[in-house]
Swiss-Prot record:
Metabolic or biological pathway: Cofactor biosynthesis; coenzyme A biosynthesis; CoA from (R)-pantothenate: step 4/5
Catalytic activity: (R)-4'-phosphopantetheine + ATP + H(+) = 3'-dephospho-CoA + diphosphate
Gene Ontology MF, one: pantetheine-phosphate adenylyltransferase activity
Protein name: Phosphopantetheine adenylyltransferase
EC numbers: 2.7.7.3
Enzyme class of the recorded protein, top EC level: transferase
Binding site for ATP: S8, F9, H16, G87, L88, R89, E97, Y122, S123, F124, I125, S126, S127, S128
Gene Ontology cellular-component terms listed: cytoplasm
Sorted UniProt keywords: ATP-binding, Coenzyme A biosynthesis, Cytoplasm, Magnesium, Nucleotide-binding, Nucleotidyltransferase, Transferase
Protein residues bound to substrate: S8, K40, L72, R86
Cofactor(s) demanded: Mg(2+)
Taxonomic classification: Bacteria, Thermotogati, Thermotogota, Thermotogae, Thermotogales
Amino acid sequence: MKAIYPGSFDPITYGHLDIIKRATKIFSEVYVVVMENKRKNYTFTLEERIKMIEECTENIKNVKIDYFRGLLIDYLKMHKIDVIIRGLRAVTDFEYELQMAMANKEMCPNVDTVFLMTDKKYSFISSSLVKEVAYFGGDISRWVPKSVERKLRKKVNGV
């Protein structure tokens, strides 16, 4: 069975990777899809985000990396995917994710959303937090892979 794990991944974190690895044990194919939202300002380009995900998941066989600009439901229909994977860090995530799951179900009744709880050691990590700490020179090595850390340091230092 195929599933999709959509997100902006700006940048990908160990929390994201935890969800990806666990999802690949449940589903035969996991599409990690970088979504583009015109209302969002990104630190990394679409191409950079895709490259980081490819580097971080190269040893996971049943992962497919892709991108999409549009409604998630349209991507699901195009690729015949019926399961959306979402990671939950805390109760506050659940409120938003439940709303999105219900909206997706309304638009496409055969789609189910599977929620995976993030490992507690990653439960406070978000891409926004990682970027903020990096901008102020803090240690982010426990939250992102080395390759991602190097790229983010280059961005924040203007190199």
